[in-house]
Amino acid sequence: MDDTLATDVAPTALPPAPGADRYRSLDFADTAATLPAGQSYDLLAAPESAMRWLAAHDLTTPDVQLYEVCAQRMRTLRAHIRTLFAARVDTTAPPQESLHAVNEALTAVPTAPLLAWDGARGLRRIQAHPTDQAVNHALATLAADAADLLTGPDADILAACGSAPCDRFLLRTHGRRHWCSTRCGDRARAARAYARRSGASD
């Protein structure tokens, strides 16, 4: 299951969707999308761009090198998270495959600092994630974040952008908000105005 798109071109003048600052999994889900103008982008299309996204979200350090297999695992988890988000928005039962994938990521590594004993410093918390497990740790963190969103109070305001063909997700931080950006909102309003004018002239 993979929603990889053909390009890693970043969207221009398109801010993060509402709620992306509170849930990294929401921003993660929106790393691949189709914009209102029909342009597609995928910020995880290549290992280099996937690494930049992880580093920008404090999910790894810049010295970690990503390979295509790691980027593919990120894209696969993203596809499953998007499927779970869509099921929540549509109030349908989520596929067991996607639940299993998120649960597998959740339990792959501990996401919290572990308690360890150091003879010189005593008890302390440590992140027991060697470099080769950096992606496992990032995916576990994103899976936990998605689970928190889907089971918490904000699940009720999770929505899909209402300006087709844009398929980004957002939190409806305002009751009547149905778009992921001003750009999408303006386009939807313009389309409605055009439809009204066309109907009046028939």
Regions found by a protein language model. Give the residues of each.
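Alpha-helical elements of the RecA-like P-loop NTPase motor core of helicases
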Residues: 27, 188-191
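Cysteine-rich micro-motifs
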Residues: 175-187
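Short helix-coil boundary/hinge micro-motifs
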Residues: 1-160, 168-169, 201-202
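Short, cysteine/histidine-rich loop/knuckle motifs that typically chelate Zn2+
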Residues: 160-165, 182-183
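Short, hydrophobic-biased amphipathic alpha-helical segments
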Residues: 142, 186-189
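Cys/His-rich microdomains that often coordinate metals
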Residues: 165-170, 188
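Contiguous alpha-helical segments
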Residues: 192-202
